Amino acid sequence: MSDPSVITRVDAPPTLEEAQEMVGGMVELVMLSDGDQMLVNEEGLLYGLPLNQKASEVANRHIVGNALILRGKAKWT
């Protein structure tokens, strides 16, 4: 398995289907301290997904699997 990735979107919010494809399953919304949002796999720990060090540092909490950061117009409302 490859290392988990962190992708940032600023142009437009992803659809639910796009977000699910990116994180590989059910989506969990994590609010970041700067007001941005991070989407992660809600069941990542159950699936044994690998630690995402970069996303964990950004979120200041343990994040596994792929993460999608939403900024500006890309935020979910």
Task: Annotate each language-model stretch with its function.
Residues 1-77:
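Detector for the mature cores of small, proteolytically processed
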